[in-house]
Amino acid sequence: MMGDHLRPMECLNICLEDNLQPCPEAYPSEIHGHPGPSEPCQEHTCPFDPPESARPDAPHGNSGVESTHLENCLVQVQARQASASLRSLEDNSSLGSPQQNQSSSTQVVFWAGILQAQMCVLDLEEELEKTEGLRAELRCCIPPPSKDLLGDEGLSPSRPEEDEDSGDDSSGPEEENQTWPREKIPGSSLEWGAEEDSIFFDNPLFLESPCSDTSTEGECFSWGYPNSHPDMKTWHQSPQTLDSPLQKGTGLWRQENELDLGSDTADHGGCSTPPFPVPSYKMHPCLALGSTEGDPTVPPDQEGETSCEDDLGHGSPKAPFVDHELIQESDNFEFDLRPATTHPVQPWGSQTSQSLSDLTQPILEDLQREDPSRSQETLISQNRGERDAGCFQEPVFCTLAPWGSQTSLLEPNCPESEGRGSGPQPSPVSSQDSSPRVLLHSPKWPQDASHLLQKDRSELSSLKEEETEEVPSLRQEAECEDTSRSEDASANQHHVHLASAEGLPESPMPQAQSPEEGWRPSSSREKLANDIRNDKGAWNLALRLYQLNGFRKSEVAAHLRKNNDFSRAVAEAYLSFFQFEGQSLDRALRGFLQALVLSGETQERERILYQFSKRFHYCNPGAFPSVDSVHTLTCAIMLLNTDLHGQNIGKSMSCQEFVTNLNGLQDGRNFPKELLKALYWSIRSEKLEWAIDEEDADRPEKDQPSPSAGKISSPFLQMAQDPTMPTYKQGILARKMHHIADGKKTPWGKRGWKMFHTLLRGMVLYFLKGEGQWLDGESLVGHMVDEPVGVHHSLASPATHYTKKPHVFQLRTADWRLYLFQAPTAKEMASWIARINLAAATHSAPPFPAAVGSQRRFVRPILPMSPVQSSLEEQHRSHENCLDAASDDLLDLQRNLPERRGRSRELEEYRLRKEYLEHEKTRYETYVQLLVARLHFPLGDLALWEDQLGKETDGSQEPRPSLKKSHSSPSLHQEEAPTTAKVKRNISERRTYRKIIPKRNRNQL
């Protein structure tokens, strides 16, 4: 058994060292005692070592021993090549694939050697994976590698995790067959053993995949070769079984990559002489380029350096270092190689990395210029000197989709979607039928492929940053788009080919567009600076805006008013959905303003109105001579609506002014006067209504912002929308404004009496038109004819000083305005007084603290107008505290009278302060009295409360026995005594009640 293993090793070492090449004319029938055509090599492996002369530290005394097996080895290799070539011819003829260069016998011999070598390396891979004990023994025998060999990450120590995985399928008999010591093998050395150990034991391609499932045999793809191979005996007879030795024979490409990588790059760079002959192995150019993908030192433009590196000779210590580094970098790529007669479309294009195409593009262009038909060949060279002559398939950009699925055939990168020159191409049906032969797949491979792809990409990302920084991001983007497509491969084959061929020089990842995305720009860079897109996108957005699909009415104008071509296209498409045929301009404008909320700046609104004018002129071409005339009149209508119904103060625009302002604006002529008058009275009688969102219309009234009532703008309008505010009283009242704010006299033109239907709701008096009864919670917007009046912190009392009209009461507001109201009867007057004061006492918030400063001028404080949320008890306590404070302030003021000879300003300040404090004291006294009466009837009717209040008032007005002032002061006349509250007075206060007053102070106090 030991001899069987030593003879192939010795044979290869002799061949590699002496540069001997076999003669292709001999055809022995057996190798190592196994029948060639029927039984694959499963037990005997042939590891191929690099020549001893290729290492500077190799011994030089082994040539005599190795030459003893030279003749036998050459005969065996030639025999296997002959048998494999015969089987290849039979398979090609049975599959019916096109035959290229059929008369070339050297080509047949070459392919036979390739296939037979694959079988040998597969056997070697299986035996090495199953023999964990052998590896442990070998590691013990191998000394540590030198530092020059470990200077790069390519020569890394073995990983124990992979060793454990690879040792799961080991068997006892096979371990015994291969437990020969490495030192006893002729032609080998410790240095080569370390390198072999790193290649075969640490290389993940020779171990089981970490994502594969080894529990079920034959269902999951494995990096190792299975224990049993029932189909390998007849693999040359079936097109399906032909894939097994090729798909799983990844070890062949790894071994050859280690042996021949330096010469491959040299061959591409222009050197056609191989460093040493290996007759039965041929490296594919894509693998050579793929292996150098991650290495920035061997790009296509630096192939000359690699050639010079090979020319240094095999004695250079750099050769094994570079080869091993490239092998480690190429561990993430696999290729499925078949004879050219089986598939004219080569399968490895779908698995080649994106950067492979970038590296090989200059080579492809040169090869295509020499012979376009070479793009169909599948590497038909018979020796290394012919590698530049044979043209491999043009690598296409690709990303790995789940293998074995139809999705992978739909990619723009798939080889079956690419044109292959003038050679025959398979039909769409045959392309789909042959997909199992094109792609390496198994029932559980899709998950493993995605996992390994991510792992490989992460390992190569650090090596690609200097050359291809954008490749990983584009590859990920392509993967996201590629996995979402599931269209028919036959329908997209020609289209994808064109997209891939045209996009090659510009984008590293051209994508096939779906029919839904055909109108969209292929990349964001194709958009202009002002976001121009095509008409299809503008029309789709306009349709969504018109149908309010995902938009509200208040959001439509934002997409129509921008100053760019796309926004104008959207606005034009949006207006195309409106039909204005036979409508007047004001009617069309009203309908348009009901569809959207016209918002934005003046120039933004003008852009939207211009699109409206274009559409109106298109629908009514005979109404106006041009679009500009329609646009001018539309803007004039908008300004007229603002002037007549806006919040402006002053005289409104008349019809004559409206006509005069538009003179000469209809393309140099005047608009018809009848048209302008009709538009004026239409807007004056009915203002333009603005659209509101449906959400705002459905929510409660208190949440809605209240629109303005005519020219009035008052914060009390918001209180009119609150349905929680109770209605205290309503009826007909005549009103007269006696003083405006701050107690100033009302101008002459505004002193007249006016009749209103007055409504007291909450703490606001509303003056409405009509005499109907208003219910609680009913909206008052649109029915008010004058500004509402707030009664917070106000006091209503009978107007005893006014004698011109009966039943008149006065209302002093918080801003010191004074209103006179006339009620129909005295009872109505008393009811209005009581209920206004009750509303003020219930809803008036406590005043803010007084300001602190050095200014001695008296200024009335500003009282809060927001309604309070406190209960009646809390309000009662608050008003009592305010009453005590006002009483104390008034007492302090009376104790500190100004000097008799003081200036007039000081006396005026004293008068204003005293008047204010007396009013505040009276107001809080009234509030406390009303709240006490209200607390007795918290839930009762206000009519019962009024009756009880009236009884208390009548009882308080009855005369009570008391001393008259004339008794204490006989000199004072009883009729001239002032009616003031009895308080404790000092001497200075008695001066105001004496009849004899100094002349200088009579008119000032």
Curated annotation (Swiss-Prot):
Record protein name field: PH and SEC7 domain-containing protein 4
Subcellular location: Cell membrane; Cell projection, Ruffle membrane
Feature: compositional bias, Basic residues: 992-1005
Keywords noted in UniProt: Cell membrane, Cell projection, Coiled coil, Guanine-nucleotide releasing factor, Lipid-binding, Membrane, Phosphoprotein
Low complexity composition-biased segments: 350-361, 428-438
Chief place where the protein resides: membrane
UniProt region (Disordered), positions on chain: 27-66, 145-189, 287-386, 407-525, 694-714, 951-1005
Any one GO molecular function term: lipid binding
SUPFAM superfamilies the record matches: PH domain-like (SSF50729), Sec7 domain (SSF48425)
Ranges of compositional bias, category Acidic residues: 161-177
Domain PH, first and last residues per copy: 726-841
Stored InterPro entries: PH-like_dom_sf (IPR011993), PH_9 (IPR041681), PH_domain (IPR001849), Sec7_C_sf (IPR023394), Sec7_dom (IPR000904), Sec7_dom_sf (IPR035999)
One GO term of the biological process aspect: regulation of ARF protein signal transduction
Phosphoserine: residues bearing it: 85, 88, 97, 381, 435, 968, 971
Compositionally biased spans, kind Basic and acidic residues: 453-465, 476-488
Organism: Mus musculus (Mouse)
PANTHER family, A to Z: GUANYL-NUCLEOTIDE EXCHANGE FACTOR, PH AND SEC7 DOMAIN-CONTAINING PROTEIN 4
Role description: Guanine nucleotide exchange factor for ARF6 and ARL14/ARF7. Through ARL14 activation, controls the movement of MHC class II-containing vesicles along the actin cytoskeleton in dendritic cells. Involved in membrane recycling. Interacts with several phosphatidylinositol phosphate species, including phosphatidylinositol 3,4-bisphosphate, phosphatidylinositol 3,5-bisphosphate and phosphatidylinositol 4,5-bisphosphate.
Pfam families registered for this protein in UniProt: PH_9, Sec7
Residue ranges of every copy of the SEC7 domain listed in the record: 493-686
Disulfide bonds: none
Entries under CDD domains matching the protein: PH_EFA6, Sec7
